[in-house]
């Protein structure tokens, strides 16, 4: 049967490609109303504990390729006589995730052995929780206002969370004709999350993966990176109630979505051609090649894992008080933080709120999301006190997100170091100087960069003196200027314009917006110290503009 199935499938796929070639995995895809997609996800997440799951080895699965098998112990490599000892930090991390996902923690969960033979699994079995998982049920709520889905809300129900150990890693050296084994990843703690098949479109799947990544990063239990393998996603998919197909080898979100698109189209094609009963009547596992899905195994060849309770490990017994204590110590979850930031008095746009509240992995060496959010909230509080009724919520938002973060990245200056010499109170004072027109926005930007640059070079530890800097660099806004001096500046700017048609257009009124160009030149020359309306008035008088 196996010998005839693959050629037939290949022949069909050739026909399918001809019929549906325009519906590629990345272009022109749409779900058809008569062919209902149903998806569930299985997500394996590596936990960022200090040590591995059942040993004292350092948990560093991404150790340099020059140090293979470096972070290993006797148990990790399965030397005879070595025994597992549960890492309690794993239990804490698992409890945090279960609470955040509204799951019911099993107060007496057990470990089991899942038997199979593979080169990077030296024990011949994996320790997992097949019969009595760590937590059951729960959900993750997707919101249209936050997660870019079509529905107002979509609740994705969860089946369970279970603790298990990761395998080693096979490194294929094709040029040498051999495979190498790196056990740095062996026995790294994983949490496997299994969802109900509640997903009915791609937006929901993309949103769930992103939201789950944000959650584990926010809780500080994992990096959540798909590209490095710290998070791995398998997809269970069916169309119109036919048998489930499991998709594997999905290294990133793009691959996950492309594989689902391709597999959906493949199954729709089989149903439309009347061959669904032949090819979709039993479950199978398929891999993603980057352009198509290929069969790995079917129900008939499913491995018998011979699960059995692990006799060397006791149960994980947790008291209700422990779960309650963990719950009470949890930080606000991302959705709650976003809601707060988008409400009064902050009134942030969703994009800006996510920059402050959602942890990314690009700037970990400069600031944590917790420290950034705290700096913003403290600055806003100080500014609010100073501004009183003149509060402009956008001012601290724009200056922290765009100017402060931009300069920190440019200078590679950690926020913690910057905050020592330029604390939130001082930042609020700078904002008030700008708001009260004591200095221009342009001068404020120059001043902020100068302060951060000096902190970076000199490691300043004391708060800066803004008044002294403004006086020293002569940055005060010029509210009154001698008319002749201003006319002289404008005359010099107009004389430097090489295109006479620009001036003619301004005078005639045909190019009124070109006057803004001249004003901009004046602002540049004066470094923003002369107000724009003074330049506008002076240019109109100089050019005898009558409109």
From Swiss-Prot:
Stored InterPro entries: Asn/Gln-tRNA_amidoTrfase_suB/E, Asn/Gln-tRNA_Trfase_suB/E_cat, Asn/Gln_amidotransferase, Asn/Gln_tRNA_amidoTrase-B-like, GatB, GatB_Yqey_C_2, Gln-tRNA_amidoTrfase_suB_CS, Gln_synth/guanido_kin_cat_dom
Keyword Transmembrane belongs to the record: no
Location(s) in or outside the cell: Mitochondrion
One Gene Ontology cellular component annotation held by this UniProt entry: mitochondrion
Gene Ontology terms, MF aspect: ATP binding; glutaminyl-tRNA synthase (glutamine-hydrolyzing) activity
UniProt KW keywords: ATP-binding, Ligase, Mitochondrion, Nucleotide-binding, Protein biosynthesis
SMART domains: GatB_Yqey
Enzyme Commission code(s) on record: 6.3.5.-
Protein's UniProt keywords contain Protein biosynthesis: yes
Catalytic activity: L-glutamyl-tRNA(Gln) + L-glutamine + ATP + H2O = L-glutaminyl-tRNA(Gln) + L-glutamate + ADP + phosphate + H(+)
Domain of life per record: Eukaryota
UniProt GO BP: glutaminyl-tRNAGln biosynthesis via transamidation; mitochondrial translation
Similarity section: Belongs to the GatB/GatE family. GatB subfamily.
Description of how the protein assembles with itself and partners: Subunit of the heterotrimeric GatFAB amidotransferase (AdT) complex, composed of A, B and F subunits.
Other facts: This protein may be expected to contain an N-terminal transit peptide but none has been predicted.
HAMAP family given in the database record: GatB
Function (record text): Allows the formation of correctly charged Gln-tRNA(Gln) through the transamidation of misacylated Glu-tRNA(Gln) in the mitochondria. The reaction takes place in the presence of glutamine and ATP through an activated gamma-phospho-Glu-tRNA(Gln).
Annotated protein name in UniProt: Glutamyl-tRNA(Gln) amidotransferase subunit B, mitochondrial
